[in-house]
UniProtKB/Swiss-Prot annotation:
Entry's Gene Ontology cellular component terms: extracellular region
GO MF terms held by the record: toxin activity
Subunit structure: Homodimer; disulfide-linked.
Tissue-by-tissue expression: Expressed by the venom gland.
Keywords: Disulfide bond, Secreted, Signal, Toxin
Protein's recorded name: U-myrmeciitoxin(01)-Mg4b
Length: 64
């Protein structure tokens, strides 16, 4: 029971951060990131109106 709840919680956290990043990206005018898993895709950073990519750390390795 606890493992199922933890798994659902992790999905909710990852999904919410994905939505927040999408909203912030559209506000600052960054292009949409590719639909890869949230922990493995590029994070959009705008510098001088040029999008830059930074890999996010793998969250699954820390939780596993």
């Amino acid at each position: 029971m606890g493992k199922i709840f933890f798994f659902v919680l992790m999905i909710a956290i990852i999904g919410s951060t994905f939505l927040i990043e999408e909203a912030l990206g559209s506000l600052v005018g960054c292009p949409r990131p590719n639909f890869l898993p949230s922990w493995n895709r590029c994070k959009c950073i705008c510098k001088n109106n040029k999008p830059m990519c930074r890999k996010l750390p793998n969250l699954l390795k820390t939780t596993a």
